[in-house]
Curated annotation (Swiss-Prot):
Taxonomy of the source species: Bacteria, Pseudomonadati, Pseudomonadota, Gammaproteobacteria, Pseudomonadales
Location(s), subcellular: Cytoplasm
Gene: secB
Native organism: Pseudomonas fluorescens (strain ATCC BAA-477 / NRRL B-23932 / Pf-5)
NCBIfam families: PRK05751.1-4, secB
Name by which UniProt lists this protein: Protein-export protein SecB
PANTHER family: PROTEIN-EXPORT PROTEIN SECB, PTHR36918
One GO BP annotation of this record: protein transport
Record keywords: Chaperone, Cytoplasm, Protein transport, Translocation, Transport
Task performed by this protein: One of the proteins required for the normal export of preproteins out of the cell cytoplasm. It is a molecular chaperone that binds to a subset of precursor proteins, maintaining them in a translocation-competent state. It also specifically binds to its receptor SecA.
Gene3D superfamilies xref list: SecB-like (3.10.420.10)
């Protein structure tokens, strides 16, 4: 009986991660030069802005929002601008501060990215433009770069 009680106590203090919900928080599309843009030779240049933010909700629940903003130009003219805010609610318990930061800053965005990419691609094709095939993003590398940038900024302010 004692072994079972210890197992239950250990399980309660063990790290826990659970995806509760994935949803589109915001979605927008603009094609300012349509329909004239459709008659031009298509030579696009794609600009991608990526951002994440985290919000602590009630007890152990966190919202992570991944924002992808794409601006596609054909020559010097903007063909379209598309943006999606893909969000998720995650239950995260019993992690130390560094693990929690990594989970919210890299692991959760990795989960959200395929959903955001699909939402953008669907939006773009519904606007009658060619499919937008975004390459995978290495959120672990981006997270490491951000940590390094913050550490460097902290060292510069101390000096």
């Amino acid at each position: 009986m004692t072994d079972q009680q210890n197992t239950v106590a250990d399980d309660e203090s063990a790290p826990q991660f659970s995806l509760q919900r994935i949803y589109v928080r915001d979605l927008s599309f603009e094609a300012p030069k349509s329909p004239a843009i459709f008659r031009q030779q298509w030579e696009p240049s794609v600009g991608l802005d990526l951002n994440t933010r985290q919000t602590a909700l009630e007890a152990d629940f966190h919202e992570v929002v991944l924002t992808l903003s794409v601006t596609v130009k054909n020559g010097d003219e903007v063909a379209f601008i598309a943006e999606v805010q893909q969000a998720g609610i995650f239950l995260i318990k019993n992690l130390d501060e560094a693990s929690m930061s990594h989970t919210l800053g890299a692991f959760c965005p990795n989960i959200l990215f395929p959903y955001a990419r699909e939402a953008l691609d669907s939006l773009v094709t519904r606007g009658s433009f060619p499919a937008l095939m975004l390459a995978p993003v290495n959120f672990d590398a981006l997270y490491a770069q951000e940590l390094q940038r913050l550490q460097s900024a902290g060292e510069n302010t101390v000096q």
